[in-house]
Amino acid sequence: MANYTAADIKALRERTGAGMMDVKKALDEANGDAEKAIEIIRIKGLKGATKREGRSTAEGLVAAKVAGGVGVMIEVNCETDFVAKADKFIQLADKVLAVAVESGAADIETLLATEVDGKPLSEVVVEEGAILGEKVVVRRISRLEGGTVDAYLHKTSKDLPAQVGVLFAVDGEGEAAATAAHDVAVHIAAMAPNYLTREDVPADLVESERRIAEETAKAEGKPEAAMTKIVEGRVTGFYKGEVLVDQAFAKDAKKSVAQVLEEAGVKGTAFARFRVGS
């Protein structure tokens, strides 16, 4: 006769995130000892971890937090959207974010090497992934500080955690700075710029766009006298698509992002945008 109850099974499932049959088998093997059963579940899960190494991790979530004027954002990946919305996975991401905030880590290597309860965070992630039955990867981290930093998370599906996250920093403080930082962070989530200013765009990319614009204009039979103006116009169009401050502001297309920031008396200093799997 089993020396555990349905309540024990439920409690262990909540603690581990494992399936009902896996929990029952572990409790049977552990003779009803919950702590031993957890160890069994972990061991069995870790045995399968090597088989999961080559699997794709295209699902997951983005988590972010601003504390003490410092913004931190992470992307944590898993294999399926089923696990991405599981409480256990979300709790793991929250744990990783907390470690990222507290440790001051600014890169993945440093973050994963940070000790949590006597072991590297990387081991904690593997163990939790084993319980979930999927490969789990902490893919990237961003850390911004100085002035005012806003963190914005966007859900692309009501059934999933945030799939898009943004950190945006401006060089001022106060209510106007905070409002502008937030509004532009929301804009970044929607419009996905790749660069903060024109100076940040690699020169070879600009030259490539210029050559393409010129060749296209020639192929279209544009007059030579107007070529310079046409090419510069198309390069400007490229900037308006790729450069944050040149983009038309999402909330009011009559203004550029640069104008919105100028009206608030601030300048953007840095941004990061994560989208799960991209």
Swiss-Prot record:
GO terms for cellular component: cytoplasm. The keyword Cytoplasm applies. PROSITE patterns: EF_TS_1, EF_TS_2. It is found in: Cytoplasm. InterPro entries: EF-Ts_dimer_sf, Transl_elong_EFTs/EF1B, Transl_elong_EFTs/EF1B_dimer, Transl_elong_Ts_CS, UBA-like_sf. It holds the Pfam family EF_TS. One of its GO terms (molecular function) is translation elongation factor activity. Keywords: Cytoplasm, Elongation factor, Protein biosynthesis. It comes from the Bacteria. Residues 80-83 are annotated as: Involved in Mg(2+) ion dislocation from EF-Tu. Its main location: cytoplasm. Associates with the EF-Tu.GDP complex and induces the exchange of GDP to GTP. It remains bound to the aminoacyl-tRNA.EF-Tu.GTP complex up to the GTP hydrolysis stage on the ribosome. Belongs to the EF-Ts family. PANTHER family: ELONGATION FACTOR TS, ELONGATION FACTOR TS, MITOCHONDRIAL. NCBIfam families: tsf. HAMAP family: EF_Ts. This is Elongation factor Ts. It comes from Arthrobacter sp. (strain FB24).
